[in-house]
UniProtKB/Swiss-Prot annotation:
Record function comment: Component of the cytochrome c oxidase, the last enzyme in the mitochondrial electron transport chain which drives oxidative phosphorylation. The respiratory chain contains 3 multisubunit complexes succinate dehydrogenase (complex II, CII), ubiquinol-cytochrome c oxidoreductase (cytochrome b-c1 complex, complex III, CIII) and cytochrome c oxidase (complex IV, CIV), that cooperate to transfer electrons derived from NADH and succinate to molecular oxygen, creating an electrochemical gradient over the inner membrane that drives transmembrane transport and the ATP synthase.
Co-factor binding comment: Binds 2 heme A groups non-covalently per subunit. Binds a copper B center.
Catalytic activity: 4 Fe(II)-[cytochrome c] + O2 + 8 H(+)(in) = 4 Fe(III)-[cytochrome c] + 2 H2O + 4 H(+)(out)
InterPro entries xref list: Cyt_c_oxase-like_su1_dom (IPR023616), Cyt_c_oxase-like_su1_sf (IPR036927), Cyt_C_Oxase_1 (IPR000883), Cyt_c_Oxase_su1_BS (IPR023615), Cyt_c_oxase_su1_dom (IPR033944)
Intervals, Mitochondrial matrix compartment: 1-11, 87-94, 171-182, 262-269, 328-335, 401-406, 479-519
Name of the protein in question: Cytochrome c oxidase subunit 1
Major subcellular site: mitochondrion
Source organism, top-level taxon: Eukaryota
Pathway field: Energy metabolism; oxidative phosphorylation
Membrane topology recorded in Swiss-Prot or TrEMBL: Multi-pass membrane protein
Length: 519
């Protein structure tokens, strides 16, 4: 019965599929909002109305893309599908909690959409800084609904994190050490630890904001002895690990894709890759104030946060060069997932370089809240996280469905998307260097050219999104079934066949000669 299968499912594959479908749907909503933003900015003058409406759209775009697209797809979708298969577990450690983790997301999404629909909407930016988010500048229920939405999404992620940590540590076969698990499993494990440690701090911050708004507390109100900068510290102590949460599972997927399409049986520098991810996870917690260089931190604090931020480039560089070394000497198979992986490596590196620029507190004073920052984080998210999702989706699509995507169209789709996102975000570096500020719906005429170019790029990206929907439809319509897969000895998830049976590995695994086989 469909209702019992999809509503009450405790099967990691079904829940993973639910996450993927939900994330894809939310991604379309987020994409629609981004196109509204670029339509508004395509020429000087107003399109949508006042800046409140514009900022509500910007805020909703950010929340949807982060909490309802990237995280559900990467952690909920790929994580649920692949982690149990890769470690040879029959399912997740807590299958019913897994179900609850998913079903907290649709109500959370509904609350976020409601927040945009009632009163004037939450036009605070995704950071929700007071006093703008206080009950004077944002009277009404909008910000409160946003806070409740974040609470639900946060609970969902914390439960999911507990589940992934328990699963990866406890549900491996006895013969498999933690250092024999695939890199994607490591990336999800580290991501889960980051979620578990950072989300409670966000919950504390937004709960204090909630009481400031409704119960007359003054945590963030100087009139009662509070400090709005405290909120920024609490938010960014979550917010910076969050951006690593968004990219780490992508690192794991890229490692698998690069290894597979280079014809290698393992990635270059496995232990280096693991330690690099652990270093990134740790360092991600001690650099948060680089988002706050303009709030009058003292010079020693600025010097520390500048240096600590730059240190993150080292483990990141280890990963980039290990991916390149994995390809070295291999027989490269130029399939679509490999194109996405190569695009990821190049564009993520570009985004990382602009990040090094922004890490300098002196430069950041001038660049903070300009389009240079927007360009930076869209290079690592819109071209990092999203490219990893696309590559992973195409690579594992046969595993999920038993069908293969149309290879030529998948490559054309990559080309269109690559052109679109670069045309959208590269010019934004120029706008930022010319001091165009973020979060404004209009701008002086001098900025017209690059804004128009950027908006044309967003339309090309839209064409790519529509192409992807068509390519997926085509695969299900044509029903090209998978015939054979190589490298199953080191790619454990493929061992069950394509598509994977509903229940896998009810018997335990034993390890013989580095090959996992059914006992």
């Amino acid at each position: 019965m469909a209702i019992t299968r999809w509503l009450f499912s405790t099967n990691h594959k079904d829940i993973g599929t639910l996450y993927l479908v939900f994330g894809a749907w939310a991604g379309l909503v987020g994409t629609a909002l981004s196109l509204l933003i670029r339509a508004e900015l395509s020429q000087p003058g107003t399109l949508l109305g006042d800046d409140q409406i514009y900022n509500v759209i910007v805020t909703a775009h950010a929340f949807i893309m982060i909490f309802f697209m990237v995280m559900p797809i990467m952690i909920g979708g790929f994580g649920n599908w692949l982690v149990p298969l890769m470690i040879g577990a029959p399912d997740m450690a807590f299958p019913r909690m897994n179900n609850m983790s998913f079903w907290l997301l649709p109500p959370s999404f509904l609350l976020l959409l409601a927040s945009s629909g009632v009163e004037a909407g939450a036009g605070t930016g995704w950071t929700v800084y007071p006093p703008l988010a206080g009950n004077l500048a944002h009277a009404g229920a909008s910000v409160d609904l946003t806070i409740f939405s974040l609470h639900l999404a946060g609970i969902s992620s914390i439960l999911g994190a507990i589940n992934f940590i328990t699963t990866t540590i406890n549900m491996k076969p006895p013969a498999m050490s933690q250092y024999q698990t695939p890199l994607f499993v490591w990336s999800v494990l580290i991501t889960a630890v980051l979620l578990l440690l950072s989300l409670p701090v966000l919950a504390a911050g937004i709960t204090m904001l909630l009481t400031d708004r409704n119960l007359n507390t003054t945590f963030f109100d100087p009139a009662g002895g509070g400090d709005p900068v405290l909120y920024q510290h609490l938010f960014w102590f979550f917010g910076h690990p969050e951006v690593y949460i968004l990219i780490l599972p992508g690192f794991g997927m890229i490692s698998h894709i690069v290894t597979y399409y280079s014809g290698k049986k393992e990635p270059f520098g496995y232990m280096g890759m693991v330690w690099a991810m652990m270093s990134i996870g740790l360092l991600g917690f001690i650099v948060w104030a680089h988002h706050m260089f303009t709030v009058d931190l003292n010079v020693d604090t600025r010097a520390y946060f500048t240096s600590a931020t730059m240190i993150i480039a080292i483990p990141t560089g280890v990963k980039v060069f290990s991916w390149l070394a994995t390809m070295h000497g291999g027989t490269i198979k130029w399939d679509a997932p490999m194109l996405w992986a190569l695009g990821f490596i190049f564009l993520f590196t570009v985004g990382g370089l602009t990040g090094i620029v922004l890490a300098n507190s002196s430069l950041d004073i001038m660049l903070h809240d300009t389009y240079y920052v927007v360009a930076h984080f869209h290079y690592v998210l819109s071209m990092g996280a999203v490219f990893a999702i696309m590559g992973g989706f195409i690579h594992w699509f046969p595993l999920f469905t038993g069908y293969t995507l149309h290879e030529t169209w998948a490559k054309i789709h990559f080309g269109v998307m690559f052109a679109g996102v670069n045309l959208t975000f590269f010019p934004q570096h120029f706008l930022g260097l010319s001091a165009m500020p973020r979060r404004y719906s209009d701008y002086p005429d001098a900025y017209t050219l690059w804004n128009t170019v950027s908006s044309i790029g967003s339309l090309i990206s839209l064409v790519a999104v529509i192409m992807m929907m068509f390519i997926i439809w085509e695969a299900f319509a044509a029903k090209r079934e998978v015939t054979t897969y190589e490298l199953t000895s080191t790619m454990l998830e493929w061992l069950q066949g394509c598509p994977t049976p509903y229940h896998t590995l009810k018997t335990s695994l034993v390890q013989i000669n580095h090959q996992m086989i059914k006992s």
